[in-house]
Amino acid sequence: MADSCIFCKIAQKQIPSTIVYEDDEIFAFKDINPIAPIHILVIPKQHIASLNEITEENEAFIGKVLYKVSLIGKKECPEGYRVVNNIGEDAGQTVKHIHFHILGGKKLAWDKL
C-alpha cells in the first residue's frame, strides 16, 4: 500500500465507500462524483500506479482485473457499459493507482475528444 494513496486507503477500508465487489485482490466501489447513472471504479488492492507500470510478473493479474471488470459491467449495466482507463496527467488520471471506470445506466454518446 502506498501511504498517501486514496485508493489504497479505500481498498483497506480506512476510507468508507459503497462497495460493489471485493475479493482478496480486487475492489470495486461506486464513484463519489459519478458522471453517469452507474459509475463504478475497479481497482487492484495491490498498488500499481498505471498501465504503464505493468510488468511480465503482473500481466496475468491485470487480465484477472479486466475479467472482473467485465463481470461487474455485465451485472450492473446489462444494457451496455463503457470502460475507461486514464494513463497519465494529460489523459486525466488524477489518482496514481490503476483503476477502471465502468460507466452505464444510460445511452452514452461518443463525442470528439
Curated annotation (Swiss-Prot):
It is found in: Nucleus; Cytoplasm. GO terms for molecular function: adenosine 5'-monophosphoramidase activity; hydrolase activity; nucleotide binding. It holds the Pfam family HIT. It catalyses: adenosine 5'-phosphoramidate + H2O = AMP + NH4(+). Keywords: Cytoplasm, Hydrolase, Nucleotide-binding, Nucleus. The active site is at H99. Its EC number is 3.9.1.-. AMP binds at D31, N86, G92, T94, H99, H101. Zn(2+) binds at C5, C8, H47, H97. The keyword Cytoplasm applies. A motif (Histidine triad motif) lies at residues 97-101. Its main location: nucleus. Residues 6-113 form the HIT domain. GO terms for cellular component: cytoplasm; nucleus. The keyword Secreted does not apply. Hydrolyzes purine nucleotide phosphoramidates with a single phosphate group, including adenosine 5'monophosphoramidate (AMP-NH2), adenosine 5'monophosphomorpholidate (AMP-morpholidate) and guanosine 5'monophosphomorpholidate (GMP-morpholidate). Hydrolyzes lysyl-AMP (AMP-N-epsilon-(N-alpha-acetyl lysine methyl ester)) generated by lysine tRNA ligase, as well as Met-AMP, His-AMP and Asp-AMP, lysyl-GMP (GMP-N-epsilon-(N-alpha-acetyl lysine methyl ester)) and AMP-N-alanine methyl ester. May also function as scaffolding protein that mediates protein-protein interactions. Belongs to the HINT family. This is Histidine triad nucleotide-binding protein. It comes from Entamoeba histolytica (strain ATCC 30459 / HM-1:IMSS / ABRM).
